Amino acid sequence: MESPDKGYRRINDDLRHDHHIHVNDKRILRICRAKSIQSTIKYSNHGCTRRAKNPQFVAENLLNRDFHADMPNEKWLTDVTEFKWYEGMTVHKVYLSAILDLYDRRIVAYVVSDRNDNPLVFKTFDRAVKANPGAHPLFHSDRGFQYTNRTFHHKLEKAGMTQSMSRVAKCIDNGPMEGFWGILKRERYYRKRFTSKKELVNMIENYIHYYNCRRVQRGLGVLTPMEKHNLFLAA
């Protein structure tokens, strides 16, 4: 089972998507209760990035919590989150930078690094641009130091993108991106102890592939992000 921590709604979605079996949510819930099947509990997300101390550039919140998009590459969200792995009593960290498309909720590009620095964010952006030539989305982030860096703003301008930033300490302004972090960590990270960097990075890479290509979402009409994306391209 790709995701043994699925709740009854996701189990029902998989039955519809993979096996064309249509049953009521309540029936699946009764079966899950009878078999003691439970989803992973939801943890609070405390990963909101703080405002840069000396921002070189600050953009207005042009997105303004309008998380609807009519086509791919219309609106991109981005953020950085951290993970820990353990070597005996020593705690190590890795950082994941990712860009999410609001139309199909696919992860457009991502980079994992030992350092939370400008190159991490710049490399993620460069990968997204390379994979989507000609894309000119509204590009939304929080006010972390990488995104308020003037060099990064110039990279956005050169790519023909408009920059948007969340208000200070308003994580909900970047809600779907924060939501993706929560999904990833709830399904693959929390309640686990990683004892090597390779194991942790493999988990992240495998999960992003699973999320894009195998994990259906009701908000996408019980499709995966890539199915939603490809349907638009084929229309």
Regions found by a protein language model. Name each.
Residues 1-71, 170, 226-230:
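Basic, flexible linker segments flanking DNA-binding modules
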Residues 92, 111-132:
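Active-site beta-loop-alpha junctions of metal-dependent nucleic acid enzymes
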Residues 11, 28, 32, 63, ...:
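Mobile genetic element proteins and their domesticated derivatives, centered on retroelements
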Residues 4-5, 20, 67-68, 86, ...:
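Conserved, non-catalytic sequence blocks in retroelement Pol enzymes and Pol-derived host proteins
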Residues 52, 141-143, 149-152, 163-185, ...:
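RNase H-like two-metal-ion nuclease catalytic core shared by retroviral integrases
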Residues 65-108:
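An active-site-proximal beta-strand-loop segment
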Residues 74, 106, 114, 126-130, ...:
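Retroviral integrase
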Residues 157-161, 183-235:
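C-terminal domain-tail junction helix/linker
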